[in-house]
Design a protein with these regions (language model features):
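Alpha-helical recognition/docking segments in bacterial nutrient-uptake
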Residues: 1-104, 172
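Short, solvent-exposed amphipathic alpha-helices that sit
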Residues: 13-27, 98-101, 126-145, 191-195, ...
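Short beta-strand elements in bilobed, periplasmic/extracellular small-molecule ligand-binding domains
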Residues: 25-36, 135-160
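Hydrophobic alpha-helical segments within soluble ligand-binding/sensing domains
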Residues: 91-116, 132-136, 158-168, 189, ...
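An alpha-beta-alpha
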Residues: 102-149, 255-275
Length: 277
């Protein structure tokens, strides 16, 4: 068995990543035990104890609840995906490059104000580089920008309410300007796009929207959304390769554990669709 711990399934990125990880069964023939961890460290530790009681051989972690130092103490092969991973092996997207591509496109499309919408990401988390790249690129090109890190919520509806509040603020604050909106993920981007359609019945020329992930919702939206494509299939495949290598090593008579964690970074691809010029 391999254990998987994900934060939730309402963000389309996580559900797509889970789909890709589960599809690796045909290559490796490992069965999976999956927990969704939304309620803090105590719950997650309980899940890990339960997974260990099933004698899992390895663990893939996407949630941010426990530190990599705590996770490394369990003494089993672990790979993190898109989270803080100082003490364990990991696979991440080059978040800086992805956000740089998105921000540059909005600048090239002559938006008057660039706005980034996200949660308040900790600096140790790889996705913080999306915020950093957005800010640094706007400053380099001397473009006015606004960073809103106020998104909070533990359900789709709670987050939608937050995005609605932010949309109202943007409408009031920047009424006569072309707005380039770069959102933390495709789920947020789809919510924002739907709010625009509810108000205007179309995507007006004074809005451009870019998401992040290229999860299925980006192409299924009312207008296909321009997005920074994380190569989710390659991330999942790389994570499985890293984990299985560690697990196979553990089975040897005298196993040699990794001297230090292995960190792999996957290049993102900007996918231009209908929400940018």
């Amino acid at each position: 068995f391999i254990g998987i711990i994900i934060p939730n399934l309402y963000l389309h990125y996580y559900s797509e990543m889970l789909t890709q990880l589960l599809s690796s069964y045909s290559d490796y023939h490992y069965k999976f035990l999956v927990f969704s961890s939304e309620h803090g460290a105590e719950e997650e530790q309980q899940y890990i104890e339960e997974l260990l009681s099933y004698q899992i051989e390895g663990l893939i972690v996407l949630s941010h609840t426990l530190s990599s130092k705590q996770l490394s103490s369990y003494q089993i092969p672990i790979v993190a995906i898109e989270r803080e991973a100082e003490h364990i092996s990991s696979v991440t997207t080059d978040n800086y490059m992805g956000a740089l591509q998105a921000t540059t496109l909005l600048i090239r499309d002559k938006c008057d104000i660039l706005i980034h919408i996200n949660v308040n990401v900790e600096k140790a988390v790889p996705a913080y580089d999306r915020i950093r790249a957005f800010k640094e690129t706007c400053e380099e090109y001397q473009v006015p920008y606004d960073i809103d890190l106020s998104v909070i919520g533990n359900s789709y509806q709670e987050i939608l309410n937050e995005i609605r509040r932010i949309f109202t603020r943007i409408e009031e604050k920047y009424p006569n300007q072309k707005k380039g909106i770069f959102l933390a993920n495709d789920t947020y981007a789809n919510m924002f796009l739907n709010l625009i359609f509810q108000k205007y019945r179309e995507l007006p020329s004074f809005y451009e929207i870019i998401g992040f992930d290229n999860s299925p919702i980006a192409s299924e939206a009312i207008l296909p959304i321009t997005t920074v494509g994380q190569q989710i299939d390659i991330i999942a495949q790389t994570a499985m390769e890293l984990l299985v290598q560690q697990m196979e090593e553990q089975k040897k008579r005298s196993p040699k554990p990794l001297e230090k964690p292995v960190h792999k970074q996957i290049t993102p691809i900007l996918i231009r669709r209908n929400t940018t010029s």
